[in-house]
Regions:
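Flexible, solvent-exposed loop/hinge segments and secondary-structure transition points
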Residues: 1-158
Length: 158
């Protein structure tokens, strides 16, 4: 048997707060979804003024990042993104009843080398969503200190 880390509400709240604080700093209205390792939401928070479509899009991004263990923008990154036309996963975005997100804003949450969830952001442009997502990952690392290692970067692929 192997011991694993389970992402809980306390960590999800901390991450969402960090993402929203960063969104306020850069003046963008974000929706944040923190999902568990199965892609199920632990927390969804939509800032006042954020789009009404944000919660579903953020959840889709968190679901994809957690389930496929990679940042969502990597699916369409040239030249070898697997979801690009002619590549092995072209059309994957239509799977899971259209919930598979292949654009920027979803990041796996990796603790001690294990994917424990995903974070999805919707509301900004790609750079803004990424900035807020990385801020959330950084906040989780700061929370754990030296007890656990969180992968804090935009390009994550396990």
């Amino acid at each position: 048997m192997r011991q694993t880390f389970k992402l809980e509400r306390a960590e999800a709240r901390l991450m969402a707060a960090a993402a929203i604080t960063k969104a306020e700093e850069i003046k963008v209205f974000e929706t944040v979804c923190i999902a568990d390792d199965g892609g199920h939401p632990i927390l969804i928070e939509r800032m006042d003024g954020a789009r009404i479509t944000g919660p579903q899009i953020a959840w889709n991004k968190a679901f994809t990042a957690a389930g496929h263990k990679r940042s969502t923008h990597l699916f369409n990154q040239t030249p070898n993104g697997p979801a690009l036309p002619g590549n092995e996963a072209f059309g994957i975005q239509w799977s899971f009843e259209g919930r598979f997100a292949v654009f920027v804003g979803g990041f796996p949450i990796v603790v001690d080398g294990e994917v424990v969830g995903g974070i999805g952001l919707s509301g900004g442009n790609g750079e803004q969503d990424t900035t807020c997502g990385v801020a959330a990952l950084k906040a989780l690392q700061e929370y754990f200190g030296s007890k656990h290692r969180v992968l804090v970067q935009a390009d994550i692929k396990l």
